[in-house]
A protein has these predicted regions:
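Phosphate-handling catalytic interfaces
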Residues: 111-224
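A short, conserved structural fragment
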Residues: 44-54
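Short, cationic-aromatic polyanion-contact patches
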Residues: 2-8, 54-75
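Short acidic, hydrophobic short linear motifs in intrinsically disordered regions
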Residues: 16-29
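Short amphipathic alpha-helical interaction segments
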Residues: 30-44
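Hydrophobic residues on short alpha-helical segments
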Residues: 10-14
Length: 224
């Protein structure tokens, strides 16, 4: 099996939901369609996935082996920020990007604030009953979890996962990312207006059905 199972193939196995198209898997993984198509062909030839009115992983043991492979790879080479956004999709429980990440997703990566590459929390809304399972899942990738952002000096690596437990989840999707609803994201930005004024103005420009009444203009900096 491991002759076929490289990082891309393992991630594809983990990303597949029965009935998915190759294009949908590529969107979930944010990987070029042709790369995914070629890997799917190899996996199908090896008998690990089938394609009949959509993709299916033929045996749950294949998925378990893929998860073990990806987690082992992460323990050797820590995930990048881009990879960290994909990893939660390999879990067996629903989630939605929240807080700063909801703003990031709804602006399609156009607004980023309060994070640096060497200090980068990801914010995930999860169901209360799944908190322990998510903690164990991220631990297998050497990604620490907490309910509030932890100081950088207390962490060994720049990435951390901040879990926001909820009784239930309302999930929407933007470019393959599960995210809390747009209205809730706007409410979060209004509650933190000073930090997100420019993001609210960006929402107004991006979504024609919105009229948030927010204008923002960056002051010009004096040239040295």
């Amino acid at each position: 099996m491991y002759e076929v199972l490289d990082d891309t193939a393992a991630q594809i196995i983990l990303a597949i939901e029965s009935g998915d198209s190759i294009r949908r898997v590529a969107q979930h993984l944010h990987t070029p369609y042709e790369t995914v198509r070629q890997a799917v062909n190899r996996l199908e030839d090896a008998g690990y996935v089938s394609y009949d009115d959509g993709l299916t992983v033929v045996d749950e043991r294949v998925r378990d082996a893929a998860l073990e492979f990806v987690a082992a790879s992460a323990s050797i080479s820590p995930p990048s920020i881009e990879e960290a956004y994909v990893i939660p999709q390999f879990g067996d429980w629903p989630f939605a990007f929240a807080r700063i990440d909801a703003v990031y997703v709804w602006t399609q990566g156009g607004y980023q604030v309060g994070r640096e590459p060497n200090d980068y929390p990801l914010f995930l809304a999860v169901r209360e009953r799944d908190v322990d399972a998510w903690g164990a899942f991220f631990e297998s990738f050497d990604l620490p979890t907490a309910f509030e952002r932890q100081p950088r000096e207390e962490l060994n690596e720049p990435l951390q996962i901040v879990l926001e437990p909820r009784a239930s989840l309302d999930i929407e999707h933007v470019e393959g990312y599960p995210v809390i609803p747009r209205d809730e994201t706007i409410e979060y930005m209004r509650e933190n207006y000073a930090q997100f004024q420019s993001a609210l103005a960006m929402f107004d420009r991006m979504y024609e059905d919105l009229d948030l009444g927010v204008t923002y203009r960056e002051t010009e900096r004096a040239q040295p």
